[in-house]
Amino acid sequence: MAESVRVAVRCRPFNQREKDLNTTLCVGMTPNVGQVNLNAPDGAAKDFTFDGAYFMDSTGEQIYNDIVFPLVENVIEGYNGTVFAYGQTGSGKTFSMQGIETIPAQRGVIPRAFDHIFTATATTENVKFLVHCSYLEIYNEEVRDLLGADNKQKLEIKEQPDRGVYVAGLSMHVCHDVPACKELMTRGFNNRHVGATLMNKDSSRSHSIFTVYVEGMTETGSIRMGKLNLVDLAGSERQSKTGATGDRLKEATKINLSLSALGNVISALVDGKSKHIPYRDSKLTRLLQDSLGGNTKTIMIACVSPSSDNYDETLSTLRYANRAKNIKNKPTINEDPKDALLREYQEEIARLKSMVQPGAVGVGAPAQDAFSIEEERKKLREEFEEAMNDLRGEYEREQTSKAELQKDLESLRADYERANANLDNLNPEEAAKKIQQLQDQFIGGEEAGNTQLKQKRMKQLKEAETKTQKLAAALNVHKDDPLLQVYSTTQEKLDAVTSQLEKEVKKSKGYEREIEDLHGEFELDRLDYLDTIRKQDQQLKLLMQIMDKIQPIIKKDTNYSNVDRIKKEAVWNEDESRWILPEMSMSRTILPLANNGYMQEPARQENTLLRSNFDDKLRERLAKSDSENLANSYFKPVKQINVINKYKSDQKLSTSKSLFPSKTPTFDGLVNGVVYTDALYERAQSAKRPPRLASLNPK
């Protein structure tokens, strides 16, 4: 069933800068009907209606309970959910998402979501939960892991038909309680890019997405996985107001481009006529693809400034928010997903139990997943024999020395014997300890008997539902047709109809002003686009002129001497938004074959001058080829060691990609609670299992 994106608007108080400028109030709100009134400097008013309107005196607790609480409940049930704050720089987006921890009423959406999730898991009976989190930022159109070992490493966005869009190499950390989540949030927030501008001393210079995965397994073994995206967007900026220069200006340019792409996606989704939705125009829209028109319940918190100095920015924010509420999503429960981390734990526990108790299986695990030590040894032996035959075949095809072959076979045999020894070293006590370590990662049911917590949770849910119903009822009252009402006198009916007519006239004038404003905005956008095109044209001409100067001095023996050919061979990569150019190569001096013996004299040329020129050029090339050491290398047969080294490098590359992936979820990773996305998502696509018993290495 399709449902619309829910939109709430929050207005912050005046800041010190606005007070110093003596700006006036331009925003008014009617919270009981979700109405926002924006007063233009010329006195004209514009009205917008949303799912919630929160003025200066509103609290983070009020916003969460009214709007976000039902969404988080749905995430625990297995839905995908997204909450993102949208607005200009300094409008209170980060404050709405993070809040102030020391003031209970002003805690933000993210810490409240942590409390909510762990309270819900603790009071739910007969379900085991696994909660893990990830934290990334998009800085200058580069995706980075804020919780990774190297938070400056650029990550790649990938897409799979059944999985959707994900970030390869993103670390996911298992959390058992609220303090663990807060520690991750604080660590990632400290790694995030922030900077000072004239409008905000702690301005976010990147978009950030904190994702909480909630996986639940019932006693029957079925798994549901919900995902909550908590998005804090960087704000749109005007250089004239922020005073940005240098790196700050470059950051602002990237921020504005990504927010512009987000606005284009929203407009295309609402338009209904667009056949193409431009999700790939930026990294932000690519990652939010499922949240806008996909399988996700989405909430937008539009943050605005009350100051008349920011009227244009506030109007733009309200317009985009008004469009966003017309986006239709189709959320469904994620049942038994292939990439569930809980399934990895489930299979590992079942595997350990079957090692010490043949025939035993884990909770909810299918019986066919259990296997005995003998079966494991048999599979190890089959893998060893297959690898040995492949290795021998490769060496025979390359006709390399037996010594090298024997050396590599011994290394392979040593790996096989080591894996067998690990099986023998696994005793019941050690296996039981490992099983307990894995089971300790699960949470759920700790407060199953706490009636007070359960009642509080149900009360909050009912209050949120009641608030939504009251808002809908209030809006329906305002939509009633006065002609359908029953009046006691004709004068009363005349007054009602006159009042309705005045409202319609006012609304009509508002639409006329809206059309004029839109024409003005379109004209400004057109001028902005023309200016951008003009600058890009200047940049392109500069690069072309530099290329014309450089091309004559490029060596003729390189493939890049032919620019037209390079252009034809270049391929555009849509995912990375860049050109994939051919590798640079240089042609070596080529002599005739050494064993050709007698070479026929070339046909006589009528023009001896041409032949003389050719001979001169050949002598010149031979003179320049001394550095290539042709005399020592040309007639020398290819060494066998070169073939061996090439085979080893190829074998190492293929092995690292297939048999020994670098980020396969091992026992240590599962116990430490740090797993990488590509270890789950790419494994779900591949039929090949990770290295056998890699998690059973004795410590």
Curated annotation (Swiss-Prot):
Tissue: Expressed in an exclusive set of 26 chemosensory neurons whose dendritic endings are exposed to the external environment; six IL2 neurons of the inner labial sensilla, 8 pairs of amphid neurons in the head, and 2 pairs of phasmid neurons in the tail.
Keyword Repeat recorded: no
Main location: cytoplasm
GO biological process: anterograde dendritic transport of neurotransmitter receptor complex; cell projection organization; cilium assembly; dauer entry; intraciliary anterograde transport; intraciliary transport; negative regulation of non-motile cilium assembly; non-motile cilium assembly
Domain of life: Eukaryota
Binding site for ATP: G87, Q88, T89, G90, S91, G92, K93, T94
Subcellular location(s) per record: Cytoplasm, Cytoskeleton; Cell projection, Cilium; Cytoplasm, Cytoskeleton, Cilium axoneme; Cytoplasm, Cytoskeleton, Cilium basal body
Pfam families: Kinesin (PF00225)
The keyword Nucleotide-binding belongs to this UniProt entry's keyword annotation: yes
Coiled-coil regions listed in the entry: 339-523
Keywords: ATP-binding, Cell projection, Coiled coil, Cytoplasm, Cytoskeleton, Microtubule, Motor protein, Nucleotide-binding
Domain Kinesin motor: 4-327
One GO MF term attached to the UniProt entry: ATP hydrolysis activity
Entry GO CC: ciliary basal body; cilium; cytoplasm; dendrite; dendrite cytoplasm; kinesin complex; microtubule; microtubule organizing center
Family: Belongs to the TRAFAC class myosin-kinesin ATPase superfamily. Kinesin family. Kinesin II subfamily.
Function: Kinesin motor protein which is required for the anterograde intraflagellar transport (IFT) along the middle segment of the sensory neuron cilia together with the kinesin II motor complex (composed of klp-11, klp-20 and kap-1) and on its own, is required for IFT along the distal segment. In addition, regulates the length of cilia. May have a role during neurogenesis and axonal transport.
Name of the protein: Osmotic avoidance abnormal protein 3
Gene that encodes the chain: osm-3
